[in-house]
Amino acid sequence: MMTEYVLILSAYLFSIGIYGLITSRNMVRALMCLELILNAVNMNLVTFSDLFDSRQLKGDIFSIFVIAIAAAEAAIGPAIVSSIHRNRKSTRINQSNLLNK
């Protein structure tokens, strides 16, 4: 019974993240939506790991790897955005084509 609620919440988070990535024009907002997507994936991994085989921790361990990747993205992403903002004076995605310089 509780599994369905967690999966529905994960689907909502994933949908909000995808919608935000598609419609956002700001790089910071796109990074935040990417974090939402990664957290929804982590919720699915842990839920299905517990649902199908709770003795093996494959989903939990893979979730830890995804959290590590998200932490690296959260550390490197704002640095890249601030560098682009310093050079281009904008964080809008459509104005930051680096190949036109």
UniProtKB/Swiss-Prot annotation:
It catalyses: a plastoquinone + NADH + (n+1) H(+)(in) = a plastoquinol + NAD(+) + n H(+)(out); a plastoquinone + NADPH + (n+1) H(+)(in) = a plastoquinol + NADP(+) + n H(+)(out). It is found in: Plastid, Chloroplast thylakoid membrane. Its main location: plastid. Its EC number is 7.1.1.-. One of its GO terms (biological process) is photosynthesis, light reaction. GO terms for molecular function: oxidoreductase activity, acting on NAD(P)H, quinone or similar compound as acceptor; quinone binding. The chain crosses the membrane at residues 2-22, 32-52, 61-81. GO terms for cellular component: chloroplast thylakoid membrane; NADH dehydrogenase complex. NDH is composed of at least 16 different subunits, 5 of which are encoded in the nucleus. This is NAD(P)H-quinone oxidoreductase subunit 4L, chloroplastic. It comes from Calycanthus floridus var. glaucus.
